[in-house]
Amino acid sequence: MRPVTSFLNRKKAPKNNGDKAEQAAEAFLRKQGLRFVERNFFCRIGEIDLIFLDQNTYVFVEVRFRANNTHGNAAESLGQSKLKKVRNSAALWLQKNNKVNNSSRFDAILFDEKIDSQHLTWLKAVF
């Protein structure tokens, strides 16, 4: 039987495609030289998938995955309502962490069909 500590300390395996896409996006952005800050910041307004630091700029990242284009591709899933929630959540995160005077931008990592680097699109300063 496995010790409880090893069970509690193991890295959480992704439960679904959303988690897998976020993990792949995080790994990709780390390889690009961005410093990881936080994952899945939740507040009453909404959620931010990933937060990174690119030099002195906080980068708020929305991650999207579409297995097929029946309901549009990943880029088309970024509606104005979602973007507004991300912007407002980011403003709250900056305020909560005393970073209001820091520069920030909003990026999107998109996966269409598969969650891998060949199907990844990085949109910088997308909104």
Swiss-Prot record:
Taking the record's annotation, the residue ranges forming a coiled coil are none
Task: Specify the domain of life of the species encoding this protein.
Answer: Bacteria
Q: Which GO terms describe its molecular function?
A: nucleic acid binding
Q: What is this protein called?
A: UPF0102 protein Mmwyl1_2395
Tell me which family the UniProt entry assigns to this protein.
Answer: Belongs to the UPF0102 family.
Which Pfam families does this UniProt record tie to the protein? Answer: UPF0102
Q: Which SUPFAM superfamilies match?
A: Restriction endonuclease-like
Q: Enumerate the transmembrane spans.
A: none
Source organism lineage? Bacteria, Pseudomonadati, Pseudomonadota, Gammaproteobacteria, Oceanospirillales
